[in-house]
């Protein structure tokens, strides 16, 4: 049993209403009651009408008598108009207002939570999901649905009061049918919802497969994992198909039962009503009045289910949100209590600190850690990855509080300060700069409230960012994209530094702050930082010792303890000391060449933001990326237009295998459509029978009640069969389309994904939303049109045979009744359905803020985020209110029109009867046949899908299906070599990325790699080193020239086989949200790797040790993108994955860059063992990795300018390699 869903009591939903809301709710409720009572009053008038026509058929004054009743209809219509308007408008407006208030309160509360809350209790996805999804559910539960509920209950109560007054005995007999009607009406939505949530759950899992696969498409392609992805995708899609068929069948069954009970209740009433007319002296009109009122009132009770479902969903959604809103954080960003001093000197002390992260309370980071940093000093923290260096920074920022011990600034416990004030004195620049989806100016402006443009420009200048910003077409106004994807890593880092400079803090915290820069920018930024660090207390966390050297004090941290402390020169004296060992690990012989990590880390960061986004990956070229984008957008617009027109026949063709099912379904649909018009004739016959002489009446009423039972039985059979058949046809179509699309996408060439239009999110939503819309185009629309056509034809035939004159007059007004029926159902379903889309933009603000909560916290930008959020919401609230008013007017008018049409019809009928052109029975037959037809059609149509959207969806889906993959991994043709030696040659290669055709990466690149050699590629960031690796794996094909493997051109070899010969370890290891075991086994293509092979690979990659030390060992789930492991651990799992593959050619793209010196040494040893007898291509900055390569090739301006061994190249006077090395030596010292 799953635990019971927690909910809040219904009245609590309204706990955030103000006096205006209370007034709106009261007025809205009064309107709803008035509107609800309108229907029973209408049946009362209908009964009077029947009597006045039935009893005065031969009377000269029939027109006068009838017109009096008709006038009452018009008055009733006017009254209902006002009531309905107040009901809808007031409830929609108050719902919109209160939901907006809850939404911003929730965001505000989220922003004030301590960081631990985000580690343990929530995620960006959850927050955004709640803000866009859950608040819509809450809005539905407290808006128009409440009005609707009050209206339906008023109809129910009013109807029964009236029925008892008019004929209590008949009413009592009919009460038998109420529970059945109400139960049938209520059970259907529950069963349907259950099936639909199963379907949604299966689809959600399928979407995760899509997101994971496309988000790491390079890894999937490199390890030929397309088949695995397809397999798991198919499994989930099949589950969803089964659920959707169940849903279709249960919906049909529900409807069938409802109509069966409905017709049987009429049968009972007709038989018993006849008895009442004979024995108790009822009139025909009274019997009809009671019949219609009781059935309609009972139905109205059944119609409350959508409201009750909405209330339940809203109460459940509110529980989590309100719980968060009421949560008091242990570290509260909005708490203004606490000390505020004139200024601080900046002395920092950690005293006996014990600390573990909330997400891993059992693993202690510090147990009694102490550290003192004098004010104005620069302190550096060094140590291996995972030793606790960044934790010190988090504690100083008070992201967390220690479990015992204290953190002091100027001798005052951090907890005693006002949090906002003390954070305002601390500036943080971290390793992965976090930018918000807004302009560069706004991003820098986060550093200081109300900063002027001059101040922002000065800060940018100081951070060495002004140059590249000026080159951008829109300068400071340039939008940086989500997470800053439009900029390279180095550019993002400089903006982050400018943001910290603008803040002018007393304490500066630099967490690997220059790691993302290449040597040149690093030198300049380091100078900027040196200027900024003057007379401030600075804490530096770094791998790279060049940054650390000049620090006043260096603390070496090992497993949460300080093992050594002192200045660079002091610590070097102890040769066996931890610091000296770290230095030794980083040095090669006597050269302190940190060439390595500067670029190394820089590229890692560039890539970190967007492993999918080639644009940032390759180039630090500033304006090109933006211009390239603009040029490309125009092209895509054109291609989009062309794909817009997709004929329905083409979609229908996909449904061809289900032809028989569709034909059967269509026939049943036709039968289904005639049920309502037949009901109209039967009802007219019944009314006629009630005014016959007693003997005939008794016989007729029995006969017609039997016919009604048969009609009920027909409904019970036809409805479920009809919906089941269409559910099967539609479900199979969706299944087919989704699988076709995903298969196509997975096998597209990697370059296709560089286009932002083909990002994993976009494709994911196209697969889910568009496929669902297409189903509506074929299955649902077809079933609907058949049903409606049958209803229309049968209704017209019946009406015209009865009295063509009256039929023509009523036909003119029928569209109005149809519109009314349509609006009524729309209202039951809710006008708020499209509220979700409106909040997308505002959600992005929340998404950004929560995703980078540490940045928001450290810059005290909570208020700023709230302002931005509220600004984006203003229009939404206005449009919500406008929508409320419009819906209210529409809803009110529709009632008025309906009642006026009724009045006109009977008035005209009475005149025709008086003139002797028709008789009383025919008037009712025409009226009921046509109105029932209209109601049937409009009810069906209101569930009609939006076909215009579906056409767009079809175009988008066929756009994918028709796409041609330039490099298709399904292509089985091509040679397979028996024995691979591993000779590689690149001949005259020219290459540009499609997304940036104006940036030439290679011009005539020539280069040979002999079998078994280790070749290192070096060059500055953006020179195209990683591109070589992409070309070798055929992620791209060169524009001209060719690449050969063992003298055979790559294009002639079977693609899948080629990729199986190569093992890639990239700079950012991409792991899947699965166990460590299955991540390693992925290298073998999933299932084939044995336990022994997996462990052997892990041992070789120096990963077995840390895997065994984790509680679940190889069964540990690594989390989304491997988030549960540290960088070094992820990298080792990735290396193990490549080893399991036993590749002939090894491609290492910055494979050890993410590791600290200690792990790097061990992994490097592992790689050295793996590289034996394999052709290896290494891209790296670190000389330790490059030095022992057989050949070093220096790439510059798209060609190879130097190649040879380390010894040869270093001795070339003024050579590129020598100057690269020199640059880094000077950067280090």
Curated annotation (Swiss-Prot):
Binding site for ATP 2: 1019-1026
Membrane association type: Multi-pass membrane protein
Any matching Pfam family: ABC_membrane
UniProt entry tagged with the keyword Glycoprotein: yes
Glycosylation sites: 56, 450, 645, 758, 1073, 1173
Any one of the GO CC terms: membrane
Gene Ontology MF annotations: ABC-type transporter activity; ATP binding; ATP hydrolysis activity; ATPase-coupled transmembrane transporter activity
InterPro entries: AAA+_ATPase, ABC1_TM_dom, ABC1_TM_sf, ABC_transporter-like_ATP-bd, ABC_transporter-like_CS, P-loop_NTPase, Type_1_exporter
TM regions (residue ranges): 22-42, 73-93, 149-169, 172-192, 252-272, 281-301, 661-681, 706-726, 797-817, 888-908, 923-943
Keywords: ATP-binding, Glycoprotein, Membrane, Nucleotide-binding, Repeat, Transmembrane, Transmembrane helix, Transport
Cellular compartments annotated: Membrane
Residues annotated to bind ATP 1: 383-390
Region listing for Disordered, in residue ranges: 594-614
Ranges annotated as biased composition (Basic and acidic residues): 594-606
Gene3D superfamilies in alphabetical order: ABC transporter type 1, transmembrane domain (1.20.1560.10), P-loop containing nucleotide triphosphate hydrolases (3.40.50.300)
Similarity remark: Belongs to the ABC transporter superfamily. ABCB family. Multidrug resistance exporter (TC 3.A.1.201) subfamily.
Protein name listed in UniProt: ABC transporter B family member 3
Species this protein is from: Arabidopsis thaliana (Mouse-ear cress)
């Amino acid at each position: 049993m799953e635990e019971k869903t927690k909910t809040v009591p219904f009245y609590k939903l309204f706990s955030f209403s103000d006096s205006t809301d209370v007034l709106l709710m009261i007025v809205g409720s009064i309107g709803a009651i008035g509107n609800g009572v309108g229907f029973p009053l209408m049946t009362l008038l209908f009964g009077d009408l029947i009597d006045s026509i039935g009893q005065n058929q031969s009377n000269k004054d029939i027109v006068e008598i009838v017109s009096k009743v008709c006038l009452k209809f018009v008055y009733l219509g006017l009254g209902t108009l006002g009531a309905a308007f107040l009901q809808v408008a007031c409830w929609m407006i108050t719902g919109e207002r209160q939901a907006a208030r809850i939404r911003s309160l929730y965001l505000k509360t989220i922003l004030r939570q301590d960081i631990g809350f985000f580690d343990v209790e929530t995620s960006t996805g959850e927050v955004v999901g709640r803000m866009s999804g859950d608040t819509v559910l809450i809005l539905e539960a407290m808006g128009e649905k409440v009005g609707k509920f009050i209206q339906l209950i008023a109809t129910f109560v009013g109807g029964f009061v009236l029925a008892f007054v008019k004929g209590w005995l008949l009413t009592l007999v009919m009460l038998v049918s109420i529970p059945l009607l109400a139960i049938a009406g209520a059970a259907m939505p529950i069963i349907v919802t259950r099936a639909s949530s199963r379907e949604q759950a299966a689809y959600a899992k399928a979407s995760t497969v899509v997101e994971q696969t496309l988000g790491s498409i390079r890894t999937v392609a490199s390890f030929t994992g397309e088949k695995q992805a397809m397999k798991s995708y198919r499994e989930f899609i099949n589950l969803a198909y089964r659920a959707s068929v169940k849903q279709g069948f249960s919906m049909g069954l529900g409807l069938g039962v409802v109509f069966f009970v409905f017709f049987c209740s009429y049968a009972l009433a007709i038989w018993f009503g006849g008895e009442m007319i004979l024995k108790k002296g009822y009139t025909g009109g009274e019997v009809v009045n009671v019949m219609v009122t009781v059935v309609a009132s009972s139905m109205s009770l059944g119609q409350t289910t959508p409201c009750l479902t909405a209330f339940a969903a809203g109460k459940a959604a509110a529980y989590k949100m309100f719980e968060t809103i009421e949560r008091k954080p242990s570290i509260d960003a909005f708490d203004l209590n606490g000390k505020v001093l004139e200024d601080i000197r900046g002395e920092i002390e950690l005293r006996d600190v014990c600390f573990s992260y909330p997400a891993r309370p059992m693993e202690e980071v510090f147990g009694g850690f102490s550290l003192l940093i004098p004010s104005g000093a620069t302190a550096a923290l060094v140590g291996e990855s995972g030793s606790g260096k960044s934790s010190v920074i988090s504690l100083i920022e008070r992201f967390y509080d220690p479990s015992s011990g204290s953190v002091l600034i100027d001798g005052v416990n951090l907890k005693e300060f006002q949090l906002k004030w003390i954070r305002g004195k601390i500036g943080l620049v971290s390793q992965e700069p976090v930018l918000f989806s807004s302009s560069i100016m706004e991003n820098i402006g986060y550093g200081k409230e109300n900063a002027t443009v001059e101040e922002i420009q000065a800060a940018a200048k100081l951070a060495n960012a002004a140059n590249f910003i000026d080159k951008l077409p829109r300068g400071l106004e340039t939008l940086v994209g989500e997470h800053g994807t439009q900029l390279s890593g180095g550019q993002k880092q400089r903006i982050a530094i400018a943001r910290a400079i603008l803040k002018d803090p007393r304490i500066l915290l630099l967490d690997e702050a220059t790691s993302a820069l290449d040597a040149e920018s690093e030198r300049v930024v380091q100078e900027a930082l040196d200027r900024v660090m003057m007379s401030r207390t600075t804490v530096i966390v770094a791998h790279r010792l060049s940054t650390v050297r000049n620090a006043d004090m260096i603390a070496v941290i090992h497993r949460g303890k300080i093992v050594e402390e002192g200045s660079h020169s002091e610590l070097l004296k102890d040769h066996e000391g931890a610091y000296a060992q770290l230095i030794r690990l980083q040095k090669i012989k006597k050269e302190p060449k940190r060439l390595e990590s500067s670029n190394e880390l820089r590229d890692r960061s560039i890539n970190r933001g967007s492993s999918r986004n080639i644009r940032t990956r390759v180039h630090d070229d500033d304006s090109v990326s933006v211009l390239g984008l603009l040029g490309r957008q125009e092209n895509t617009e054109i291609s989009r237009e062309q794909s817009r027109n997709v004929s329905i026949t083409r979609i229908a063709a996909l449904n061809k295998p289900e032809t028989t099912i569709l034909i059967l379904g269509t026939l049943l649909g036709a039968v289904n459509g005639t049920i309502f018009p037949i009901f109209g004739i039967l009802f007219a016959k019944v009314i006629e029978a009630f005014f016959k002489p007693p003997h005939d009446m008794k016989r007729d009423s029995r006969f017609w009640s039997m016919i009604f039972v048969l009609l009920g039985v027909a409904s019970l059979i036809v409805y479920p069969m009809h919906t089941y058949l269409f559910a099967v046809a539609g479900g199979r179509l969706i299944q087919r389309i989704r699988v076709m699309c995903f298969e196509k996408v997975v096998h597209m060439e990697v370059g296709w994904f560089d286009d932002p239009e083909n990002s994993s999110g976009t494709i994911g939503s196209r697969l889910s939303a568009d496929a669902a819309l297409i189903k509506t185009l074929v299955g649902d629309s077809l079933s609907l049109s058949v049903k409606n056509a049958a209803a229309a034809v049968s209704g017209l035939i019946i009406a015209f045979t009865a009295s063509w004159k009256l039929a023509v007059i009523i036909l003119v007004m029928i569209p109005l009744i149809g519109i009314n029926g349509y609006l009524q159902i729309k209202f039951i379903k809710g006008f708020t359905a499209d509220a979700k889309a409106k909040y997308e933009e505002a959600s992005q603000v929340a998404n950004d803020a929560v995703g980078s909560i540490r940045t928001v916290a450290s810059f005290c930008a909570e208020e700023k985020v709230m302002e931005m959020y509220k600004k984006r919401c203003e229009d939404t609230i206005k449009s919500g209110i406008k929508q409320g008013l419009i819906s209210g007017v529409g809803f009110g008018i529709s009632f008025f029109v309906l009642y006026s049409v009724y009045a006109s019809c009977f008035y005209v009928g009475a005149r025709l009867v008086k003139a002797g052109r028709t008789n009383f029975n025919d008037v009712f037959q025409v009226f009921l046949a046509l109105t029932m037809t209209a109601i049937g059609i409009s009810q069906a149509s209101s569930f009609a899908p939006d076909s215009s959207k579906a056409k767009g969806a079809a175009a988008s889906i066929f756009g994918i299906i028709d796409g041609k993959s330039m490099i298709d991994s399904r292509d089985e043709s091509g040679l397979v070599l028996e024995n691979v030696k591993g000779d590689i040659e690149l001949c005259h290669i020219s290459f540009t990325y499609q997304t940036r055709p104006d940036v030439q990466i290679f011009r005539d690149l020539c280069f040979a790699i002999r079998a078994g050699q280790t070749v290192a590629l070096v060059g500055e960031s953006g020179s195209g080193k990683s591109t070589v690796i992409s070309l070798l794996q055929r992620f791209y094909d060169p524009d001209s020239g060719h690449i050969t493997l063992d003298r055979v051109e790559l294009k002639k070899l079977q693609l899948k086989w080629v990729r199986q010969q190569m093992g890639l370890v990239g700079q950012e290891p991409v792991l899947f949200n699965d166990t460590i075991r299955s991540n390693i086994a992925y290298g073998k293509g999933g299932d084939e790797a044995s336990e022994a092979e997996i462990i052997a690979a892990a041992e070789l990659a120096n990963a077995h040790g840390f895997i065994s030390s984790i509680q679940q060992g190889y069964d540990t789930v690594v989390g989304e993108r491997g988030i549960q492991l540290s960088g070094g651990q992820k990298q080792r799992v990735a290396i193990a994955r490549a080893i399991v593959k036993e590749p002939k050619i090894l491609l290492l793209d910055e494979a050890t860059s993410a590791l600290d010196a200690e792990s790097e040494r061990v992994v490097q040893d592992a790689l050295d063992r793996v590289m034996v007898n394999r052709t290896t291509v290494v891209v790296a900055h670190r000389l330790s990795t490059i030095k022992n390569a057989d050949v070093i090739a220096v790439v510059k301006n798209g060609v190879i300018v130097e190649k040879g061994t380390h010894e040869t190249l270093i001795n070339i006077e003024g050579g590129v390699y020598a100057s690269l090395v020199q640059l880094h030596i000077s950067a280090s010292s």
